[in-house]
From Swiss-Prot:
Name this polypeptide is given: Uncharacterized protein MJ0053
GO function term, MF aspect, one: tRNA 2-selenouridine synthase activity
Residues the entry annotates as binding ATP: G17, K18, T19, G20, C21, G22, K23, T24
Organism this protein belongs to: Methanocaldococcus jannaschii (strain ATCC 43067 / DSM 2661 / JAL-1 / JCM 10045 / NBRC 100440)
Keywords, sorted A to Z: ATP-binding, Nucleotide-binding
Transmembrane segments: none
Biological process annotations from GO: tRNA wobble uridine modification
Length: 227
């Protein structure tokens, strides 16, 4: 098993799962032991529709292509890479196209599904998106106003209006619940239906989850005679 390109093989371990279940934190732990292609970090954006909020300044497509291909070349030397699956594009209002190698689910040799308790997910979403000051609050509201324009279904427009109202009232926990239910859940379910996980990790502790995945990766690398 493995991915064949340019006459070489590379095993790809993919992390899949809901926004807010700690995939990025787990990926950062795995960087200590494994070659990781961090698409979000390279793009300078998060993988969700709110990806380019606040301090994040997303790269141009040209910069992104150059840097991600450099990381792919580095990973080839190890024969494998760990990647958080982002889909075909990444970003918020503007999007960057992800190379086919990492965009196509079929190229992922092993699929690792990260799940977590609902409360953990919502609290993590709050910690990521809660504005630190009035300026950030204004940015967040404007982001949803722009987002609203991209929706045609009345129920989606109403959901965004409700989210904006909750943000104005500083009810970030309630806003996060609505964001997860109306904006993230369908996208997540669509991706999860496409995969048959080789490993499911219920993430309540990032270090413990990373250790489980680390052991799984090492086991598979042994099977492929890579360690």
């Amino acid at each position: 098993m493995g991915l064949s390109f340019n006459g070489e093989n590379m095993i790809i371990f993919g992390l899949f799962g809901k926004t807010g279940c700690g995939k990025t934190e787990i990926l950062n732990e795995l960087k200590k032991h494994h070659p990781v292609i961090d698409i979000e970090e390279i793009a300078r954006t998060r993988g969700s529709i709110l990806g380019d909020l606040y301090h994040l300044s997303m790269r141009s497509q040209e910069e992104f292509d150059y840097l991600i291909n450099k990381e792919i070349e580095k990973a080839k030397k190890f024969g494998y890479a760990v990647v958080e699956y982002e889909g075909r594009k990444i970003g918020g209002e503007k999007k960057l196209k992800i190379p086919e190698l990492l965009a196509d689910i079929k190229n992922y040799t092993y699929k690792i599904l990260i799940d977590c308790p609902y409360e953990c997910q919502i609290n993590r979403l709050v910690s990521i998106y809660k504005p630190k000051n009035e300026k950030e609050k204004e940015i967040l509201i404007n982001k949803f106003l722009i987002l609203k324009e991209s929706f045609k279904k009345p129920e989606m427009i109403e959901a965004v209006d409700n989210i904006i109202e909750l943000i104005k009232q500083d009810k970030y926990y309630e806003a996060a619940k609505l964001i997860e239910e109306k904006l993230y859940r369908e996208h997540y379910m669509r991706n999860v239906k496409k995969i048959k996980p080789d490993l499911i990790v219920y993430n309540e502790d990032v270090k413990k989850s990373a250790k489980i995945i680390d052991e799984f990766i090492k086991k598979k690398l042994k099977e492929h005679n890579l360690i």
